[in-house]
Amino acid sequence: CKLLKEHGHTVIGWDTEIHNETNDITGYCDEYYNIDVTSRAVCGIYDAVVHLAGRSVVPQSLIEPTEYYRVNVMGTANLLEKISTPHVLFASTSSAWEMASPYARSKVAAEDVIKEKADGYTIFRFFNVSGTDGVNHQLGDPTHLIRIAAEAASGRRDKVEIYGTDYETRDGTCVRDYIHVVDLSNAILNAIESGPTNTPYECLGSNTGYSVREVLQTMQEVTGKKLNIIEAPRREGDAVSSVVDTLSKHVTLTKSIEDMCL
């Protein structure tokens, strides 16, 4: 929202305010509404719609699969039924290839809904989004590694757990691709201004994989803090490795893994 406003776009924001204690995008919107993507209140005519709504925590999806299909799939269908726009930009997931969790499967199903119902679309498969633009808009309890490690480095968390150390990777821990939120936001802006691609999907990442141990080591080097690292069993639903093979043409990388740890 902030970047779109800075580039002269009129921004209408929808959110459920689930994370109301820290979520305040109203200052970056010309209009703002507390609306759930599954609600009958969804409506309107727009030049483009950036669909970021949905449930996104893999372990939770294993416990509440029906809720993930309701929000991520039915919510997407509801959105496309109620709005009119020539361009839907959808935030899908890098988990889509292995489909090892209800979360991943719900996102793939939502992709299919968009391909069937949208007049024009750009489907982005987000890899691990990290970092800030210098303003704290982090929502709720952290579920992603870099933010968890940052909390441990700042003393707000007493440990960081590594879930699985016996994977077939260079150091036995899972490997992920990370993209800074600033680079991701610029890619979305570029896509809005370029128009729909109507291709199966595009990848938003960095084309570089980092293991869990490598990320934690980088956090320690950047912050100068030693983390209390605990090795734990593998976690159901985790992919061994997830790294971009071909980046979206809309991505220009300006930030490093070190920037994400600041």
Task: Explain the meaning of each model-derived region.
Residues V49, I63-L89, D112-V113:
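NAD(P)-cofactor binding segment of oxidoreductase domains
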Residues Y69, V73, A100-V108, Q138-R147, ...:
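Short-chain dehydrogenase/reductase
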Residues C1, I148-L262:
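C-terminal substrate-binding subdomain of Rossmann-fold SDR/epimerase-dehydratase oxidoreductases
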Residues A100-F127, R147-R157:
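Active-site Tyr-X1-5-Lys
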Residues V37-R70:
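NAD(P)H-binding glycine-rich loop region in Rossmannoid oxidoreductase-like domains
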Residues A96-P102, F124-H144, E168-T173:
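Flexible, glycine-rich beta-alpha linker
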Residues H51, A77-A104, G120-F124:
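Conserved Rossmann-fold NAD(P)-dependent oxidoreductase catalytic core, especially the SDR/UDP-sugar
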Residues C1-A48, D141:
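N-terminal Rossmann/SDR dinucleotide-binding element
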